[in-house]
A protein has these predicted regions:
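Cytoplasmic-side transmembrane-helix entry/capping segments in multi-pass membrane proteins
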Residues: 7-11, 62-72, 114-128, 146-150, ...
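Hydrophobic transmembrane alpha-helices of multi-pass small-molecule transport proteins
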Residues: 47, 51, 74, 106, ...
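Glycine-/small-residue-enriched transmembrane alpha-helix faces in small-molecule transporters
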Residues: 1-36, 72, 80, 139-166
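Specific transmembrane alpha-helical segments of multi-pass solute transporters/efflux pumps
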Residues: 17, 48, 54-92, 96-97, ...
């Protein structure tokens, strides 16, 4: 399978899984930190099981700080996502979270110094307008906080993507 097909399958799978994520957080009817705890524990167990493979252990030993930074960014992503869903509408969270690749493009440009295509800059501009519209509809402090958490979640995903792009040997 070529990289394009693999990437498309991964993105499509991620969209399907994440489309139910906000609903599941709402259905849990628990406080945010309880949900964060259980999500974190399950993520730790899943990633821990994955890291038992010889290739993953070698990757962890080769660059432990990068691996730890990636894990920390995943934790921030999860925490901010749950807090966002609790504080604002799932629709707002999904719209704002969809900007993660655009954050990755910005971080890649300004941190890694890579060039960004014109159509990506145009997409970033359109997404920024969309985020302004979402934030303009935040009539309460709680909505505004939720939208802010969603933006932080999206930025953490973008930062993690940039980190992994810089260090492709990390599993």
């Amino acid at each position: 399978m070529n990289d394009s097909t693999r990437g498309l399958l991964l993105v499509s799978s991620g969209i399907v899984v994440l489309s139910f994520d906000g609903l599941l957080v709402r259905l849990a009817q628990a406080d945010g930190w309880s949900i964060v705890f259980w999500r974190g524990l399950l993520m730790f167990l899943a990633l821990g099981a994955f890291s038992l493979s010889a290739k993953s252990r070698a990757s962890l030993k080769a660059q432990p700080l990068i691996s730890a930074a990636s894990a920390l960014l995943l934790a921030f992503t999860s925490i901010f996502f749950v807090l966002a869903v609790i504080h604002t509408t799932v629709a707002n969270v999904v719209v704002v979270d969809s900007t993660a690749p655009l954050f990755a493009a910005l971080f890649t440009r300004f941190i890694l110094g890579e060039s960004v295509a014109l159509h990506t800059w145009l997409a970033i501009g359109v997404a920024a307008l969309g985020i302004m519209i979402v934030f303009a509809g935040a009539f309460t402090a709680t909505d505004l906080a939720g939208n802010g958490y969603a933006l932080l979640s999206s930025a953490a995903v973008g930062a993690n993507l940039t980190l992994l792009r810089r260090n492709p040997a990390i599993e």
